[in-house]
Amino acid sequence: QSRSSAASDVYKRQLVFYSPLQTIFWYDKPSFYHGEPEVEWFENLQTVFDDTKVLDGTPGKNITMARRKGQEWFLAAMTNNDGSKENVSLSFLDKGKTYLAYIYTDGGKEVKTRTQVKCSYLLTDASKVMKFDLKPSGGAAVRFVPVSKDEAKKYKKYKGEVL
């Protein structure tokens, strides 16, 4: 059995497997924290949600689901030991709104943190399909936050690239 990647652990135990007792302890020991940016996921992840959608999934292969609290959405995609390519329609987002997507994926050795989680910040909306190349036993997590036009000027748009 493969060991789960750090990015996979960010949401595997936190979003897909529901529990109102969400803590950073499920991801790592607080004493091991050295400013890794993906910890913002835990700072913002809710414990109770207003809506849950299973977007895709096959038992033993993969799952993609989204949960909403207020105007924010949290998405998690996980795969098995084989890895997978996932195309996730963002049609669950409110139409006409622009969202800042806080994206957490397995980054590998090019990410110079102990956890090797790649953090990306891109603008998107309900018309887009996000593409992920999930590593074996890996996945992706995304937090979608509505942004104003002024705030949106600070970020690049998601253009369909594989994440």
Residue spans of the language-model regions?
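Solvent-exposed beta-strand/loop surfaces of large extracellular or lumenal domains
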Residues: 103-127
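C-terminal beta-strand-rich structural cap/linker in extracellular carbohydrate-active enzymes
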Residues: 121-160
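Mobile "lid/hinge" segments at catalytic clefts and subdomain interfaces of large enzymes
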Residues: 9, 22-23
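Single conserved hydrophobic/aromatic residue that forms the stacking wall/gate
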Residues: 1-7, 11
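Carbohydrate-binding surface patches
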Residues: 58-99, 140-141
